[in-house]
Amino acid sequence: GNAASWGGGVAALGSTFNMYGGVISDNMVSASAGGVLLSDKSVMNMSGNAQISNNIAPTKWTTSGGGVYIFASTDGEVGNCLYMSDNAKISGNTATQGGAVYVRKNGQVTMSGNAQISNNTATENGGGVYVENSTFKIAGGAPRVCDNLCQDVQNNVYLATGNAIRISKLSTFAGKIGVSTQDTPTESNLVTVAAVAVEAGGGGHLTEEDLDHICSDKENLYPVLVGGE
């Protein structure tokens, strides 16, 4: 493995990084982005059997993105993007926030196929993915975000205030996504955790079948369909 301040394995700056296979593993950083840093409107495509595993952004202070850190875009446009398809996998990574992935302002994470984010750890929030003012999208297939932990408790996709999982209606979704939210839902104050993705040729409504694949990380909470079909 390697050691760096940011991007222990790869730092993509204003570029496209295609990872069709192979492994980025056992890297450590002193700041954030243990495995991969995406900045300056970069795109990363993980496909085939590509893996990002066992990278560390130290937890002595606030660090983010043990596997991948998706930097903020400040011009209001979609910025840095991570696309996971086929059997791509991010596992065994550690950070303070976003054990596997931390995606900031105007970033995007899209999962499809049998992509998987599992067995990552955060000490604060987002054992799997920390989503802050960004898009986390499911584009069909059977992707899974599960068995990620924060302080020994399930904490998979952590949605900061105002964020929701976006589900494409152009193809069938049959995976499993665990969800935690910054805002605490109550009977009188529902919190949106999923919505239809905005895309060309898309539209429609979420269904009960869609919600069968979204589950709360807290045992006493469960998603309900509002205004769908």
What function would you assign to each model-found segment?
Residues 28, 42, 77-79, 149, ...:
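Intrinsically disordered, low-complexity regions of eukaryotic proteins
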Residues 139-229:
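Extracellular/surface-exposed low-complexity segments
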